[in-house]
Amino acid sequence: MLQNTVRCVSKLVQPITGVAAVRSKHSLPDLPYDYADLEPVISHEIMQLHHQKHHATYVNNLNQIEEKLHEAVSKGNVKEAIALQPALKFNGGGHINHSIFWTNLAKDGGEPSAELLTAIKSDFGSLDNLQKQLSASTVAVQGSGWGWLGYCPKGKILKVATCANQDPLEATTGLVPLFGIDVWEHAYYLQYKNVRPDYVNAIWKIANWKNVSERFAKAQQ
């Protein structure tokens, strides 16, 4: 599990090799739009806090944990390396999930590609059925977590899945993440209060189908 999480985190940065090389640090990605661009579905205030505070905290914590892990491994301290696993998974997953989430959203997200729409109809019957199934599963997440549309490389099918907390989809299920819905309360509470279904149903209005379609095409390669 730890190896899978590390592998997913490593995809976000360019690996640096060599004994004398300086290890790269993770950084907070810029958003491909302004904080107010997703209104009225998601407010400027939520977007700014979510990005600058919550995601930034995952990035900072992840860098600190990786420093500690590097030190533990270099000293052969297996006990310390194991003790760092939960924090690595949580903060690494938070960075991975949010980096996908931002690109999954857009003011004018368009429509699924012909190839993706064909797959959706094959696996769910219709786009409407997919939206209903993913929305229902996401709303039903107990506590904090994520709802996902993922692609199963082995079965070559689309699947709906949920993950608790910040567990990264690919590292924990083997599904390639295509579209994610964040249902941590910080993602919606300032605007939607305790009515999670309203937030989940509204997010489809800003789904970036171009990005989802590109992820689907890449996942099949």
UniProtKB/Swiss-Prot annotation:
The enzyme's E.C. designation: 1.15.1.1
Gene Ontology BP annotations: removal of superoxide radicals
Top enzyme category: oxidoreductase
Cell location: Mitochondrion matrix
Cofactor note: Binds 1 Mn(2+) ion per subunit.
Span of the transit peptide along the chain: 1-24
Principal location: mitochondrion
GO CC annotation: mitochondrial matrix; mitochondrion; respiratory chain complex
Annotated residues for binding of Mn(2+): 50, 98, 182, 186
Molecular function terms from GO: manganese ion binding; protein homodimerization activity; superoxide dismutase activity
Disulphide connectivity of cysteines: none
Superkingdom: Eukaryota
Record's catalysed reaction(s): 2 superoxide + 2 H(+) = H2O2 + O2
Cofactor: Mn(2+)
Any Pfam family hit: Sod_Fe_C
Keywords on record: Manganese, Metal-binding, Mitochondrion, Oxidoreductase, Transit peptide
Family matches, as InterPro entries: Fe/Mn_Superoxide_Dismutase, Mn/Fe_SOD, Mn/Fe_SOD_BS, Mn/Fe_SOD_C, Mn/Fe_SOD_N, Mn/Fe_SOD_N_sf, SOD_C_sf
Family statement drawn from the similarity comment of this UniProt entry: Belongs to the iron/manganese superoxide dismutase family.
Assembly behavior: Homotetramer.
Purpose of the protein: Destroys superoxide anion radicals which are normally produced within the cells and which are toxic to biological systems.
PANTHER family linked: SUPEROXIDE DISMUTASE 2, SUPEROXIDE DISMUTASE [MN], MITOCHONDRIAL
Protein name per its UniProtKB record: Superoxide dismutase [Mn] 1, mitochondrial
Organism: Caenorhabditis elegans
Name of the gene: sod-2
